[in-house]
Every structure is written in C-alpha cells, then in structure tokens.
C-alpha cells in the first residue's frame, strides 16, 4: 500500500490513473480520505475555471470564424487626478488557456502572475499612453480614444477586428463594443491586466519622484491621503489640471 506521501505525489501529476483514485477511495486511513477530498476539490475548481474561460471567450470564438487576428482593448486610469491613461491591445492565440479576468476582480499578486504569461503567449501586445497634458488638452474621453488608437498602431501584427470595452477606437477596423467587456472577453481581460500592471508600476515610480501624495497606494486616485498631499505640497507635473480638485488647488 502506498504511503500518504506517495499518494500525494501521485495526485499532483497532470493525469491520475483511475486505479489510483479507486485505491485511495478504498483506503480507510483518515489522511487518505483528506487527500482524495482535496484532489476532488481541485478538479472541480479546474473544471469551473475551464467553463468560465470558455464563456469569456465566446465573442472571440464567434469572430475567429471570420478573423484570424482579433485584438482586445482596454484602458486603465480614466478617473485619477494624476498620472496617465494607459491602454493595451492584445491579440491572443486561439488556444490561450490562462484564467484571465477583469483586472479589477484580481489581486495585485494575481495580475502580476498573469502579466508575464500574457506577454509571452500573446501573438501581439501594443501599449498606448495619454499623459496628463494630453488629457487636459483633449478631455479624458478623447485622450483615451487616442491612446487606444496608439495601442493598436503599436501591435506588431495587424489586427483584423477589435473587441473594445464600451468605447469606439478611432481606427479603420471593424470593432465590437462590449459592456463590461473585461469580464466578458478574454482578449479585453488580458488587455486590462497588461494596462493595469504597467500603469501601477508607473505610479509606484512617480511615488518616489513625488513623495507625499501616496501614489504607490492610491495610483493617482483622489484618496484622503492624496488630497492631503495636494493641499500640503501643491500640484505636481503629473497632475491633471482640468480635474476639479487639482483645478481648485491651483486657484487657491
């Protein structure tokens, strides 16, 4: 009879022989029952992830019947008082299996784990950035559109169709706008993760350049600590001067 450690090693394999599971089921040791229960929970979780991933790839699968290269686009940073809007365009291979989801539903650790896998396995990734000056000049919505067009232009493989999270991209390509696209499309979800990780890292860098605003934690959003820093230290070169609290500080 295998030891519990041996069973544990066998259950960690990619494929477990039915005979192993049958033997474990007949094993009267309490530890054996716990190992089997843990294995079954993992299998159920994996099956649920596969179903969810298939659901979130339904728009891609529809479009892949017509287009080989479908790019998902998303943005991060429309609401903050400081820093840029960052956009990403991602073309995923048809066999992509990583459990990407709306970046807001993932922890920072989960995003950082998925980020390199997206960069490695994607057919192409393009980044667009609209800094605070562009935002002040164009308005936040148009600046985001321009950054999205920039992200498409930076793809090393030309997309044939776009999936976009509730916006229109000013490029001459067929595009489908989805409400809550980052939760309903794996391509948009992947783009949201890439854009979020890049923007967060930028804001952490800015936190070192402009201490006193807590950029590393608030990412430029108008938190209590950020507003206190704005009152105490004034407006930095990365603040959006057209946004209310910043504009008010300039007038005071």
Swiss-Prot record:
One of its GO terms (cellular component) is cytoplasm. It catalyses: Endonucleolytic cleavage to 5'-phosphomonoester. SUPFAM superfamilies: Ribonuclease H-like. Its cofactor is Mn(2+); Mg(2+). GO terms for molecular function: manganese ion binding; RNA binding; RNA-DNA hybrid ribonuclease activity. One of its GO terms (biological process) is DNA replication, removal of RNA primer. InterPro entries: RNase_HII, RNase_HII/HIII, RNase_HII/HIII_dom, RNaseH-like_sf, RNaseH_sf. Its EC number is 3.1.26.4. A divalent metal cation binds at residues 74-75, 165. Keywords: Cytoplasm, Endonuclease, Hydrolase, Manganese, Metal-binding, Nuclease. It is found in: Cytoplasm. Manganese or magnesium. Binds 1 divalent metal ion per monomer in the absence of substrate. May bind a second metal ion after substrate binding. Residues 68-252 form the RNase H type-2 domain. It comes from the Bacteria. Belongs to the RNase HII family. Endonuclease that specifically degrades the RNA of RNA-DNA hybrids. This is Ribonuclease HII.
């Amino acid at each position: 009879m295998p030891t519990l450690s041996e069973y544990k090693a066998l259950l960690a394999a990619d494929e477990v022989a039915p005979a192993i599971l049958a033997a474990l089921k007949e094993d009267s040791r309490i530890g054996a029952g716990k190992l089997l229960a843990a294995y079954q929970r993992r299998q159920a979780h994996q099956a649920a992830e596969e179903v969810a991933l298939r659901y979130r790839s339904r728009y891609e699968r529809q479009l892949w019947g017509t287009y080989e290269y479908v790019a998902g686009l998303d943005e991060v940073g429309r609401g903050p008082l400081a820093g840029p809007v960052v956009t990403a365009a991602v073309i995923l291979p048809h066999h992509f299996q990583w459990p990407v989801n709306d970046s807001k539903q993932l922890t920072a650790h989960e995003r950082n784990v998925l980020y390199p896998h997206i960069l490695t396995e994607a057919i192409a990734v393009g980044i667009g950035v609209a800094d605070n000056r562009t935002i002040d000049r164009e308005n936040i919505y148009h600046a985001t559109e321009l950054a999205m067009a920039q992200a498409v232009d930076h793809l090393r493989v030309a997309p044939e169709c776009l999936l976009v999270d509730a916006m229109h991209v000013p490029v001459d390509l067929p595009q489908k706008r989805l409400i809550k696209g980052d939760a309903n499309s794996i391509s948009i979800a992947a783009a949201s993760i890439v854009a979020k990780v890049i923007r967060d890292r930028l804001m952490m860098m800015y936190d070192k350049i402009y201490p006193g605003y807590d950029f590393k934690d608030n990412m430029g959003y108008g938190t209590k600590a950020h507003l206190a820093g704005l009152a105490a230290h004034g407006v930095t070169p990365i603040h959006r001067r057209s946004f209310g609290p910043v504009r008010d500080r300039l007038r005071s």
